[in-house]
Structure formats: C-alpha cells, structure tokens
From Swiss-Prot:
Protein localization: Endosome; Mitochondrion; Mitochondrion inner membrane
Name the UniProt record assigns to this protein: OCIA domain-containing protein 2
Domain OCIA: 1-120
GO biological process, one term: hematopoietic stem cell homeostasis
Keyword field: Acetylation, Endosome, Membrane, Mitochondrion, Mitochondrion inner membrane
Organism (species): Homo sapiens (Human)
First-listed, main subcellular location of the protein, grouped into a coarse class: other
Amino acid sequence: MASASARGNQDKDAHFPPPSKQSLLFCPKSKLHIHRAEISKIMRECQEESFWKRALPFSLVSMLVTQGLVYQGYLAANSRFGSLPKVALAGLLGFGLGKVSYIGVCQSKFHFFEDQLRGAGFGPQHNRHCLLTCEECKIKHGLSEKGDSQPSAS
C-alpha cells in the first residue's frame, strides 16, 4: 500500500519540473505560464508605434512651425547659430510629447493580457508567488493563515 501511494505521488509530480529547476513564477496549482515573448513583443510594438505614429510626426510638425515662426519674424534667430537652437528644442519637445501621448495606447495593449500578467510583477498581487495560494506554496514560502485570510463581509 505504501508503494502504491509513492507511485501515485511520482505520477502526480511527473509533469512538474524538479524544485531546483523551477522558476520563481512557477505555481503547481495554477500552472500559470507567463508569456515573456508576448510581453517583449508588446513592448517592442509600443516603442515602434509610438515613434512612427506620434513622436516623429509631433517632432517634425513642431520643428516646421518653429522654423516658420523664425522665418516670418515672430521668433528672433540667434546671431551666431540662427534658428537651429529653437528648432532643435522644438524637435526635442515634440518628440517627448509624442512619446508621452502614446502611453494610453500602450496601457490598453497591456490590459488585454492583464490576467496573464497579473502574477508577473504587474498589478496589486505582484509580490505573490502564485495567483492561487495552494498548500504547496504556503509550505514552501511559509505563509501564515492569518496573513492570507480576508475579512468576511458580515
């Protein structure tokens, strides 16, 4: 009978990696798989799209407007450098404003994967090892029953 239970434990743990090879994000109960490739893909898309769709156009438009204002005489050109300092500053400000204006779009892309990312350092539960507090996690990380319990509504 003891050999049957030992064999049952081996079958149960056969699909789990050994503890020495488990990552910090491994949870035996939820089997949460963090899609790091998807996260890096979203970050790369956000960087490229924010550059091409917002930062570059804002920068070019602000530089053209500033050059036009200097040419029309509304802004004074520097005697040594001409309009270059004002145009360069306008370009930098336009670039920065373009990047900042795209933050909301990138946040909405990350919210699409919110459930998958919640255990990987995003959201209020980012310090927890598992999304679900299983018995193995409680034992492994020494979680107490007092700290994990939530107050009742009554």
